[in-house]
Amino acid sequence: MSVPFAISFLLLILTMPIGGQESNPDSSLSPVVEASWAAAQRAQQQKDYATAEQEYRKVISLSPGFAEAYMNLGLVYELQSRRQDALAMFEKAVRLKPGLAGAQFLLGVDYCKLGDAKRATPHLEAAVRARPDLPDAWTWLASAYQVTGRTSRKVDTLQAGLGANPHSIDLLYLLGQAYQQLGKDAVDRIQQKDSESSFLAQLLAENYAVSGYPSVAMLHLEDALKASPARAGLHIEMAEVLLHAGNLKRAEDEIAAELRLAPHSLRALVRLGEVKLLRGDVPAALADWSQAVALDPARSEAILGVREFGFGDTSQEKLTENLRAQLTGLRSQIESQAGPASRLALAFISTQEDATRAVASATGAGDSDSVKSVSPCALRQIRTWLATDLLQLVAACSAQMLKQPLAADLRLEIARALYETGLPEPALAALDGLAPAQVDSPQAQYWKARCYKRLALAAYLRLFEVDPDSYRAHQVLGDMDEAREEDSKAVEEYEKALVKRPTLPNLHYQIGHLEWKTYKTPEAREQFQAELAMNPRHTGALFDLGSTYLQERQADKALEYLKRVYDLDPKYPDVHQFMGIAYTRLNRYAEAEKELKIAAPSDKDGTIHYQLARVYLAMGKSAEAQREFALSNQLRVVTHRNNEERVQRIAAAEAALKQP
């Protein structure tokens, strides 16, 4: 949050009449004090800060217990960039009146700007207690929790803030960001636990599929199947990638493989009906879908993208143009049929013709159908329902079942049922009930990652409902474009956001980062400097700015920025490598060696070991240089082999996707 954004919070307070404040704790303000107070406020509004300071000091000398005077004097100092003087006044104000929201808020903001989020937190907590109706206070508190590594606490804070400010686009955006971060944390835990896990490969496949890279998604699904060939859920995901690309034969083969592992899979049954429909076999397709709708109408609709559970993440993808044309040609034949399966088919065709036409229900299923009350909720019955994929019945019994001790595998399956029936928050609660050793398992973290993704999407959907043309909406669109590597579109959206809110944090950096990717150095530097003008502690802007000078071989200037990054965050990615390169170019080899040795364990392709070898050669340490050259060569060979294999696999996947 920028300085003007933070100070806007106090404009409300400054314009409040004195009668609306708890002024002097002993008595009402005297006429002399009121006159000086009014004069101070007039001067402040006219930006005559010297007069404002003089008048506020008169108020303080006449009424030393008047906390608001200290707060407003602190704001005058803040407006003149006299931060230490401002802090002293705010501290005095909160000692006199701990419930003074403005002073607590500005103290918290200033400590955040100084990089002391831990010290800022209690002041921001006091601010939201006193004024829960002010979104900015919740926003800064959430940011403080984020900086101190308490992302879960950040989520709780944002949800509480939205309870009091349900239409705050800032809180909704930050909530989506927080859920995304929790999802990334879950993926990182899988990576740390088992980098070869099929659950990690599956998550990567899902992300590539939704980002428009089906061939890469297929590679990761192949890796997942190689790691866990008997695990249900992988073949059907492969089938969906193939189906959406138009390879019906391979898709049908994968569906058959899924049904061998999970004979009662609703998802496989629905997709099998879709394949039959795309082949023009309407009776067979409707027969499959009649069976699916009888089992679970709401999930059947969601699988086909006809309906959403409110999270914007249905499995529906646009089919190829040829397949969509074939579907349209079947409409009249389907319209002659009666029943929920035909209605589902017609709704499916409509969504393929217009992807925005997801409906509440095509079959008459209500939102409650997936969680209707059932009895009895016996353990044996739960396992039977799970085995037959009757997940809506499992979800209905989940609250009762989760109160008792359960085997880890059963708790995980109940969490899956809750997620699949559109209940990610209860699913997360179920996963949190696992024992510590189990909650970090790849399977548990996989479902957590998926739950957080749904919740992030839900937050962004609410944001668009509040204001689809807001600066935060354009920021979300830009983030989506950047994730798809559509950089020019991302820059356009970020620029639209800045037009609406010029002081929006991080956007100048994001634009600059994208400009720097294509070596538009002057444009990138301009954006980085704009970001640093608002936030001198922005490590991303500092690092990228240093990188621009390093690329131009201005090592001294690069080090100025890289050292600032290191001082703020010694673990910032690549900072040690880049500092090592800068020191090398300045012939400061001992310092270069130190930095590159710190960076070496993260070397993936041999680059850092090669740079270190060159340093040792310059230092006359031939044995050490030969060792580093050998390590570099080993990594380069492995990287080259892996890249060649990946290229070949992607080519094979692309060929498979093009087959009818």
Question: Where in the sequence are the language-model features?
Answer:
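Terminal, low-structured helical/coil segments at or just beyond the last alpha-helical repeat
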Residues: 24-27, 181, 185, 189-199, ...
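Alpha-helical segment of the N-proximal tetratricopeptide repeat
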Residues: 31-62, 79, 200-211, 346-349, ...
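Helix-start (N-cap) detector for alpha-helical repeat units in TPR-like alpha-solenoids
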Residues: 33, 67-68, 101-102, 135-136, ...
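Structural signature of tandem alpha-helical TPR/SEL1-like repeats
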Residues: 46-58, 79-92, 113-126, 147-160, ...
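Structural marker of alpha-solenoid helical repeat scaffolds
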Residues: 62, 96, 130, 164, ...
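Canonical tetratricopeptide repeat
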Residues: 72, 106, 140, 174, ...
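TPR/TPR-like (Sel1-like) alpha-helical repeat modules
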Residues: 162-165, 173-181, 193-194, 283-300, ...
